Amino acid sequence: MPFLDHRTGPSYGTIDQMEQHSDDEGERFLQEQCDTGRFSSDITSISEDSVQEGVRKIEAINLTWTARSLVIAYVSIFLMSFCTSLEGQTVMSLGAYATSAFSKHSLISTVLVVQNVVNAVIKPPMAKVADVFGRFEAFCVSILIYVLGYIQMAASTNVQTYASAQIFYSAGSTGLQILQQVFIADSSNLLNRAFLALLPEFPFLVTVWIGPTIADAVLKHASWRWGYGMWSIILPASFLPLALSLLLNQRKARRLNLIKPKSRPRGGVFAVLRRTWYDLDMGGLILLSAAVTLILVPLTLAANSKNGWKSDSIVAMIVVGLFCLIALPFWESSKRLAPKPLLSLHLLKQRTALAGCTLAFWYFMAFYFSVQPYFYSYLQVVQGYDVATAGRVTQTFAFTSTIAAFAVSILIKYTRRYRAFVIAGCVVYIIGMVLMMVTRHEGSTPAQILVTQVVVGIGGGLLNVPVQLGVQASASHQEVAAATAMFLTSMEMGGAVGAALSGAVWTHNIPRKLRLYLPEENKGDADAIFGKITKALSYPLGSPVRVAINQAYQETFKKLLILALIAIIPLVPLSLAMEDYKLDKMSEEPLVDPVPAEEGEIEPNRHVKRT
């Protein structure tokens, strides 16, 4: 059964086996139907339901897909995913050197907190932007923001500029991530979605190995700045095929009169701004962004503040953040303040959705205590790995989790169940974390360390995709997008909390332990060693200073792993709380009845789906 079949509709015909027809015949038939008004009832009903402009566009575009154009679109998605994946694997190894260039190596966690905060809050509004303005337009905005972030990082002269650039970078990259998943949801059903949703992840199987090598070459022959700046050229080039695919099919839909001309907005500029405010739920977005940012960022900044937790600015940020967090559910529950809420809180009344989102939170928090953000630095300093080797070890998680997720997506398709894989994934993930604790001491062999990452990666791959699928299955058809956004937001929130707490532990313990263990004549270098990984690596392995540095790193990393072991305690109980749906009995039904074809006619793309 093919995964892609344009004739039966982008959302519901992906597994039907039907007779092949040429693209030209399909387009001629579609033109005839448009000319005779065969689709008028469907399009009119959509308009009368006040569906947002971006949704109307993609529904019209869905009617114009041919087999060739749909395949090109998916190939384009893969091409762009390959570039973003390679970029991610390359620049991951550059972060330590970029922050060290500003003598702020410890602020890696703060940078990651900024990234995770943006990742957590940007997914729901980015999906709404795509619905309000259109998929093509949203992709273009994401690419532009992405490029601006990389230009700013490459040109940054201090850690503040570098950290602020993460806002643009994270917003752009997260926008691309959610838009790719929205596009895939437009052309897949529930059983095949687990497999097709992995399409953007498949490049990791290759890029995970070549990314660190590219980073090593960039550092040796150029600079970390060029390692960031080159992607501002490569990424837009990789986006061109997808952009042309969407643009040409959008123009085809206009030519066939499937996209009606926009009516002039009523009420003037103020009315347009008011509608946009409610469409995007800007109030909810502001409260969510403020709550997450003002609570998590101070956790890593307190250690570098002059008065620590007693600093007035730190206390003020946390108090305001807590106020925004308390106000958020009241705002989102108000029909007057948020008629189109950013977060569908009522979904959390579903046991499976609540358990799945909570599981994702703790799973990703444990990841940011263990694999990110300081495992890479630990491998270089304590184990003596070079840039490429340390990068490959840390990226083993991405490689093995992708393979495991691919395997489990195929098994889900044929077993039509998902919960058993969630439970198995949680157990394997816990075993991997325990192995990381056992092998975290100096002198562990490369094979031992590699095995821990393989096991953790398999566990992550086994549980991640099935949990997302379970959360989606627990929601109604109209709420699938909201359920997906809440799942991804919960996961990013867990990562943000993990990164913030790991940064607080790191910045509190490393300087103190360096002053405790360094030889008397080197105690004055503690701040320099803490601030720059290159300074720590400058002392040869086995020297008294390096022994002291390694001891400080090992003891601090042990504390992070203890936090990871605490975070994974709820995983198995939460997996058991999820309902074991039989997925083939929960297939989504189209919102609009298909147009019947006359005998002997070619069936066009019949179903119109709202995302």
From Swiss-Prot:
Q: What induces or represses this gene? A: Expression is induced under iron limitation.
For this chain's UniProt record, which GO biological process terms are given? Answer: cellular response to iron ion starvation; transmembrane transport
GO MF, one term, reads:
siderophore-iron transmembrane transporter activity
Principal location class:
membrane
Q: Where in the cell is it found?
A: Membrane
Q: A Gene Ontology CC term for this entry?
A: plasma membrane
Gene name on record? mirC
Glycosylated sites: N62
The record's similarity note reads: Belongs to the major facilitator superfamily.
Effect of disrupting the coding gene: Reduces growth under iron limitation and increases sensitivity to hydrogen peroxide. Decreases intracellular ferricrocin level under iron limitation. Leads to increased abundance of siderophore biosynthetic enzymes and of hapX. Finally, decreases the virulence in the Galleria mellonella animal model system.
**Superkingdom, taxonomy of origin:** Eukaryota
**What name has this protein been given in UniProt?**
MFS siderochrome iron transporter C
Record carries keyword Lyase: no
